[in-house]
Amino acid sequence: MPRKLLGVLLAMIAFCAIVRAADDPFLGIWQLNGEKTSNYQQQSQMIINVPAPGGFTSYRATIGKDNQSSTETHPVAFDGKPYQTTGGDAREISYKRVDARTIERTQNRNGKISVDTEQVSEDGKTLTVKQANAVRVYEKQFDVKPAKR
């Protein structure tokens, strides 16, 4: 993993450790499980979800099949409004909470709309992202808990 990307990830882990968080099962650090993932064009991806007003902020660090890295950030707010991503994969994203463990994500990439479902398992250890022709499976590496005072 490139040093710069590793540095960003370590900084986010430290940040997560001190942040107060609600009991949202999506919060934490998620690592792509390539063996359980189907039809995904990237070599690896880590998702870091940290608390933010109205939902959370999602940071995504990706290593492509060509070993090139990219990062992308976007707010996850459940207000139905589209928000622009920053970084590698430019698009607008809006979110709808289906239930406590399921969210629906609508993406607009240059006028092309796609919808996927993200669901956290009952035990909170697996995040599954279902798209039209792909399934990505992530395993929780680090759980964000409220800071003790």
Regions found by a protein language model. Give the residues of each.
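Bacterial N-terminal signal peptides
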Residues: 7-17
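Hydrophobic small-molecule pocket/channel-lining residues, especially in calycin-type beta-barrels
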Residues: 21-149
